[in-house]
Amino acid sequence: MIQGSIVPNITIFDRDGRLDAAKTSWHMRWMFEHGVDGLFLTGSYGAGPLMSNDERVEVYRLARDVANRFQGKFLLPHVGCIDTQSSVLLAKEAEKLGAVAVGAVPPFYYKHADDVIIQYYREIIEAVKIPVFAYNNPETSRYTFSFKVVQQLQKLGLAGLKDSPLNVGFITRVAYDAQVNNKNFQVIIGTSTGWLPFYHMGVRACIAGMNNWAPEIMTAMLKWTYAGDEAMAKKAYLVMMDVSARLHFTDSTIASHMALYARGFDAGYPRKPMLLPPFSDPKYKEIRNDIRAAFETLGLEFTTGTHHVIEA
């Protein structure tokens, strides 16, 4: 079973749109040092749909090299593409590089019928020996999983479901069905939202965008949850929900870059067409103050880097 705090980590590019290997590796290392357990690579946050297959494999390699410096850290690459052939290729490359599992969003842009989606996952599952997770993200894929389709995919060997929309009726049915019927099938929530209630129904892993810029908060929340300190876990959950909402003023990838800059870390650039606001934008200072306040509320040390985007 995959457990812990996972990050859908951003991929950092340079001014000319090339992969910035040094900054991307630094960011992975920094998150691991602050308690993140695993990396969900080249997903929506990580600009996977904006990258070539070779670039995505290079990110997997960078992640492997960073993870190998730590104990107990793991890689869960996202391999979903608009076409089946590329998704299968990326799954095979991820397996070669030591990933514990792969996740795949359904083929996007075109609207596909259930039988097409099932065949897509069948080919990925049959191509590798490591677990394959489907990624339910209707906002980006134009496809919404049904309980019936999940059941069919389970028979083909699907290992689990990463779910982002958190339709309570759907996700509780999938999770409890697996528990009651002793299915080897895991639900991972694709957001920090809902962590506490879903933990109490058996969910043990979440993929949280906040880990990109405030992994300390997520680490503390999960630590208190696992320790049974319900009062502190609830307090951390409320703080997490508040500061997360404050960062949802723009695309999550852009917000993650901005939040890192607000903490004084050089986060390079997102890939175009995504654009960062100029550093003169007062939003950077507002973000810094919001994150600092969240840390102070939880008694966490607020560390900053040396990149002077804003005045302290």
Predicted segments, located by residue:
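Short glycine/serine/threonine-biased micro-segments
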Residues: 2, 36, 41-44, 78, ...
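Catalytic alpha/beta core domains of metabolic enzymes, predominantly
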Residues: 126, 138-250
